[in-house]
């Protein structure tokens, strides 16, 4: 079994191209992770997701603990076997979903108590329980339990949140079962305040996580403020460890973040947009529901090798989406995931060549 490691092969200014080695294989960076919230990438087979070029996907602790339960998945051989995905899996800690989906959640020093959005059952999620659930799932990369600071937040509110996240990170780290090829990432918080981002980073670096994530962005602050935070936050982190920007997935945001030193991304944008009839292309987004595509016999993109582009016209995709046919969601999702993996591949190529890539879309 391979040890967990991160090797930077090439840098261009702050942008890095490299490889993360894990127990479940290698991850080429910069990397985009499709989101498999409930143990599936919606409208896709796991092997089809692999064919798009994805090296890693994301699963969600909150949803999987509720259904079918982490204990059941463990009895069935772990999440990799359960969903027939044999590459790395990163699971989030569940905290963000608890705080955003549960109408009645209470945050204390111990953790977060909440009611299931499914049936109202009461649960308590603590740093220890979150870490245990991710262990039972067999996650390649486990995320420390954190409080995602709401936006906007005052300096004092953000400071209190950072301090709680640091204490929870310490408990998460102590609960983490170290195994060769597996990792745990700490999550930097601090809202839009440089002083707090720096303090959060310093506190978590002391805990010696295998990697670090930047949380609390893409929550309403806008691209300008997000990039401002990214201009300085990666500088506070070890350069020899992966840096993951959570929940960010617009192509322009990815490009701007990579140029500021980010290595990993996740977002529901390609899958959700695909199911809603929106395709990403090198020439801009295409709303396939638009009536102008009803007689368009051309593919979404001529040089895209996904099944939607190789085998079907925009007119056919328009028809499928308009009538609500499941195949339409599948083909549009397949195309979008392929687009995002091609985007990451192109970015890696430009970094290796020592060239700017801010014009890529």
UniProtKB/Swiss-Prot annotation:
- Cofactor requirements of the protein: Zn(2+)
List the protein's name. Queuine tRNA-ribosyltransferase
Residue positions of the active site: 92, 266
The organism that produces this protein has a lineage beginning with: Bacteria, Pseudomonadati, Pseudomonadota, Alphaproteobacteria, Rickettsiales
| Gene Ontology process terms (BP) | queuosine biosynthetic process; tRNA wobble guanine modification; tRNA-guanine transglycosylation
This protein's pathway reads:
tRNA modification; tRNA-queuosine biosynthesis
What is one cellular component GO term in this UniProt entry? cytoplasm
Tell me the organism.
Rickettsia canadensis (strain McKiel)
Q: What is its EC number?
A: 2.4.2.29
Bound cofactor: record note: Binds 1 zinc ion per subunit.
User: What ranges does the record give for the region RNA binding, renumbered to this chain?
Assistant: 247-253, 271-275
């Amino acid at each position: 079994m391979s040890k967990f490691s991160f090797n930077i092969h090439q840098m261009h200014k702050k942008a890095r191209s490299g490889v993360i080695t894990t127990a479940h294989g290698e991850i080429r960076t910069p990397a985009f992770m499709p989101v498999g919230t409930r143990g599936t990438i919606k409208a896709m087979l796991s092997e089809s997701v692999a064919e798009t070029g994805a090296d890693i996907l994301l699963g969600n602790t909150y949803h999987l603990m509720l259904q079918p339960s982490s204990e059941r998945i463990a009895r069935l051989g772990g999440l990799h076997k359960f969903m027939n995905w044999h590459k790395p899996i990163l699971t989030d800690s569940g905290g963000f979903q608890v705080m955003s989906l549960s109408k009645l959640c209470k945050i204390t020093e111990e953790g977060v108590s909440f009611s299931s959005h499914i049936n109202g059952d009461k649960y308590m999620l603590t740093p220890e329980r979150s870490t245990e659930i991710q262990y039972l799932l067999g996650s390649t990369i486990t995320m420390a339990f954190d409080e995602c600071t709401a936006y906007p937040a005052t300096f004092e509110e953000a400071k209190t949140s950072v301090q709680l996240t640091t204490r929870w990170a310490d408990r998460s780290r102590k609960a983490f079962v170290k195994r060769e090829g597996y990792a745990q990432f700490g999550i930097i918080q601090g809202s839009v305040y440089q002083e707090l981002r720096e303090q959060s980073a310093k506190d978590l670096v002391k805990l010696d996580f295998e990697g670090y994530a930047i949380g609390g962005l893409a929550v309403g602050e806008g691209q300008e403020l997000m990039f401002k935070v990214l201009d300085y936050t990666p500088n506070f982190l070890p350069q020899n460890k992966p840096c993951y920007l959570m929940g960010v997935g617009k192509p322009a945001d990815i490009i701007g973040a990579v140029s500021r030193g980010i290595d990993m991304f996740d977002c529901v944008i390609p899958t959700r947009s695909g199911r809603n009839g929106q395709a990403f292309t090198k020439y801009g987004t295409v709303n396939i529901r638009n009536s102008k595509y009803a007689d368009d016999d051309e593919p979404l993109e001529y040089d895209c090798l996904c099944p939607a582009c190789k085998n079907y016209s925009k007119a056919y995709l328009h028809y499928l989406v308009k009538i609500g046919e499941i195949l339409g969601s599948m083909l549009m999702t397949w195309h979008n995931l392929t687009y995002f993996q091609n985007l990451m591949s192109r970015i890696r190529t430009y970094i290796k060549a020592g060239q700017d890539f801010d014009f890529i879309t």
